[in-house]
């Protein structure tokens, strides 16, 4: 029996320990937001957070996440309460086909959690492992930059108003 936390809930599963995390989340827990793209950890469509770090889950055996915290796109925000990146994706009309977008958002969220004010080059480096076959890279980058800029503006306002 493998236990872990999935989107804030303690869960367990009794599957082959070599089963990729992606398939456990999709097939056993019915969370379909993370996608299968390549099966080799190259495209990023399957990206989830494991203890806060972006990880390609199509090549991550479920045994590797025992007792860890997993966050999927479903755990990042809700339709009623979007994560700032999800809102920015809408504002900047990022998706075209949408297939890769959950992985893109998860990679971007891990980046901004680790570095709230990334440079253009840092965004490129962090997002390099996520492929968008539709070529939406400029819109993806603008959305990430807008969230970073808005967070910095909010932090500056909070400090000015004595809330920080």
How should each PLM-predicted stretch be described?
Residues 1-164:
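Signature of N-terminal electron-transfer/Fe-S-associated modules in redox systems
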């Amino acid at each position: 029996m493998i236990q872990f936390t999935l989107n804030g809930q303690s869960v367990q599963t009794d599957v082959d320990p070599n089963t990729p995390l992606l398939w456990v989340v999709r097939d056993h827990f019915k969370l379909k937001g993370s996608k299968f793209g390549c099966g080799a950890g190259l495209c990023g469509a399957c990206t989830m957070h494991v203890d806060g770090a972006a990880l390609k889950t199509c090549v991550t055996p479920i045994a590797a996440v025992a007792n860890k915290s997993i966050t999927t796109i479903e755990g990042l925000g809700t339709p009623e309460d979007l994560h700032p990146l999800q809102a920015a994706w809408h504002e900047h009309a990022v998706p075209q086909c949408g297939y890769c977008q959950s992985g893109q958002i998860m990679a971007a969220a891990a980046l901004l959690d680790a570095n709230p004010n990334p440079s253009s080059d840092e965004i490129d480096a962090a997002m390099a492992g996520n492929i968008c076959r539709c070529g939406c890279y400029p819109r993806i980058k603008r959305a990430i930059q807008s969230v970073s800029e808005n967070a910095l503006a909010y932090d500056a306002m909070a400090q000015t108003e004595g809330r920080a």
